[in-house]
Amino acid sequence: MDKQDVLNCIDLIEKVPYATAVVCGAKSAYVTEPDEEIRYNVEMYYERKTIVKDLREAVKNDAIVKVAVYFKKEKAEESMKYFENVGKNLSTVLSGASWIDIANKTEGKGNAVKAICEKYSIAHEEAMAFGDYLNDMSLLESCGESYCMKNGHPTLKSLAKYVTEKTNDENGVMEVLKNL
């Protein structure tokens, strides 16, 4: 992501109620001193994390790939309005009841799968993906065999070719893979 776009995102997020920015770079995910709830949620999704005093320092020292925004009280969907004009080169997507992802419009899971398929001569119809939230839309669209988890977002369920019989908490992906 462009450094100025990331800085603009940080400035905006600091003004949004219930919002905490997680700046995701090639080296680490960066967050300011989190309370227990935020720490738990960041640790659930990010293996490498660094606590910083100011997120702007992370922008100077790492290649940032996305900015994730965590909302207390599951306010992500109603907070999307704050990010409508986040930047002409950026996309904003609901990635969970408490999460929004901001990234370059030209990047994403779908483009990554397309690049891998092209590199290894895998046909679109032969590619398989699983998703549960709106940040997985391009991923599922890029694969001929697309699965939404049973507990996934309704919009994603309507897009996917299949819906799993079990949730991701019930190992729904493994159940599908065992039955292939």
Whereabouts are the PLM-identified features?
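Glycine/small-residue-rich loop that forms an oxyanion/phosphate-binding "nest" at active or ligand-binding sites
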Residues: 1-7
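Catalytic cores of large soluble enzymes that bind and process phosphate-bearing ligands
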Residues: 1, 71, 165
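Mg2+-dependent phosphoryl-transfer enzymes with acidic/Ser/Thr/Gly-rich catalytic loops
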Residues: 101-180
